[in-house]
């Protein structure tokens, strides 16, 4: 069989040597491309894994507290261009968690100098019922937190349109949207631009005049007629959100002190917190006005620090 195979290859070489060489070259090229593809897929997978890990590390989830805003005055704009957008900005600072281990307590003083004095004294003897307990005061090292500014702009000239049916070619749908949103009887007006995304079934409509977007947004839906069929598309404000001045910070709490050495105490935590509070309220013990005390005698607790 091996001899027959060699004879066959020899016959192929004799009858079409150029084609045989070309086939061999193509085969080698295909093998090389296949190897490169496998290598590239491995590199892509590795980079995607690293990207996911980096994304998880810098993901932020914060519940922004409700803030009451006070209306002060009305400004008269110098020209219509100042009415084209509504903008606002606010700063967000994340809370930094700290785990209080069993036998530890955190005490926060009203003044920084009191906390620093308690730390500098290091050893303190606190009377816990019949026990004169020695505790050690240490600074509280905090994990990294983040701080950034959020800028939000709401356009008075543009609107978002979603739930657009995929029934026309892209250029036809763009023309249909422009025609539909320019009809004044439906609250529309002259359209300056249509940015249509067929894949997501959405579009951004930009109007020429201020006020048209506001009229359309009052109804939340808008009629879109295609081939004598009325489709109800959803309209919503067009907003742009920017994150600026993103900062990662870490450090040591200036007013809070970590107390250790209470592992052997078996009492109600609130009673121990009151006794610690009383001890460190006294100036003769190196203390001062106490803001809050939190101790852990059983399960660890999580305390949150704000900037």
Curated annotation (Swiss-Prot):
Domain of life: Eukaryota
UniProt KW Phosphoprotein keyword: yes
Residues forming coiled coils: 30-64
Sequence positions bearing Phosphoserine: 16
Induction summary: Up-regulated by interferon IFN-alpha and IFN-gamma. Induced by IL2/interleukin-2. Induced by Sendai virus.
Compartment(s): Cytoplasm; Nucleus; Secreted
Gene Ontology CC terms, in alphabetical order: cytoplasm; cytosol; extracellular space; membrane; nucleoplasm; nucleus
Keyword Nucleus belongs to the record: yes
InterPro entries per the UniProt record, alphabetical: Nmi/IFP35_dom, Nmi/IFP35_N, Nucleotide-bd_a/b_plait_sf
Any one GO molecular-function label of the UniProt entry: identical protein binding
Region feature (Disordered): 1-24
Outcome of substituting residue 27 to R: No change in TRIM21-mediated ubiquitination and no change in Sendai virus-triggered type I IFN-beta production. Loss of TRIM21-mediated ubiquitination and decreased Sendai virus-triggered type I IFN-beta production
Post-translational modification: Ubiquitinated. 'Lys-63'-linked ubiquitination by TRIM21 promotes interaction with IFI35 and inhibits virus-triggered type I IFN-beta production.
Any one GO biological process: cell surface receptor signaling pathway via JAK-STAT
Cross-link (Glycyl lysine isopeptide (Lys-Gly) (interchain with G-Cter in ubiquitin)): 22
Tissue specificity comment: Expressed in adult spleen, liver, and kidney. Expressed in fetal thymus, liver, placenta, spleen, lung, and kidney but not brain. Expressed in macrophages.
Described purpose of this protein according to its UniProt entry: Acts as a signaling pathway regulator involved in innate immune system response. In response to interleukin 2/IL2 and interferon IFN-gamma/IFNG, interacts with signal transducer and activator of transcription/STAT which activate the transcription of downstream genes involved in a multitude of signals for development and homeostasis. Enhances the recruitment of CBP/p300 coactivators to STAT1 and STAT5, resulting in increased STAT1- and STAT5-dependent transcription.
Entry remark concerning the domains of this protein: The coiled-coil domain is necessary for interaction with TRIM21 and for TRIM21-mediated ubiquitination of NMI.
PANTHER family given in the database record: INTERFERON-INDUCED PROTEIN 35/NMI N-MYC/STAT INTERACTING PROTEIN, N-MYC-INTERACTOR
Name of the molecule in the record: N-myc-interactor
Organism: Homo sapiens (Human)
Lineage: Eukaryota, Metazoa, Chordata, Craniata, Vertebrata
């Amino acid at each position: 069989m091996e001899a027959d195979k060699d004879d066959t290859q020899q016959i192929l070489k004799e009858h079409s040597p150029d084609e045989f060489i070309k086939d061999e070259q193509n085969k080698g090229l295909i093998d090389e491309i296949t190897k490169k593809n496998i290598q590239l897929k491995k590199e892509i997978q590795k980079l995607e894994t690293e990207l996911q890990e980096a994304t998880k590390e810098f993901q932020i989830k914060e519940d922004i507290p409700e803030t009451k805003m006070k209306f002060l005055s009305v400004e008269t704009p110098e020209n219509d261009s100042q009415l084209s957008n509504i903008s606002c900005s606010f700063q967000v600072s994340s809370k930094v968690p700290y785990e209080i281990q069993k036998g530890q307590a955190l005490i926060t003083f009203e003044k920084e100098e009191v906390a620093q004095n308690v730390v500098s004294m290091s050893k303190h003897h606190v009377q816990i019922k019949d026990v004169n307990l020695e505790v050690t005061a240490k600074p509280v090292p905090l994990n990294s937190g983040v701080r950034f500014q959020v800028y939000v702009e709401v356009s008075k000239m543009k609107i978002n349109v979603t739930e657009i049916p995929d029934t026309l070619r892209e250029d036809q749908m763009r023309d249909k949207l422009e025609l539909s949103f320019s009809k004044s009887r439906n609250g529309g007006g002259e359209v300056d631009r249509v940015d249509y995304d067929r894949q997501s079934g959405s579009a951004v409509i930009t109007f020429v005049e201020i006020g048209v977007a506001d009229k359309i947004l009052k109804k939340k839906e808008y009629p879109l007629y295609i081939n004598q069929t009325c489709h109800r598309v959803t309209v919503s404000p067009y907003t742009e959100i920017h994150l600026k001045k993103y900062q990662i910070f870490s450090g040591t709490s200036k007013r809070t002190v970590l107390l250790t050495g209470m592992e052997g105490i078996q009492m109600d935590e609130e009673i121990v917190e009151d006794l610690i509070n009383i001890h460190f309220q006294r100036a003769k013990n190196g203390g001062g006005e106490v803001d809050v005390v939190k101790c852990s005698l059983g399960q660890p607790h999580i305390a949150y620090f704000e900037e």
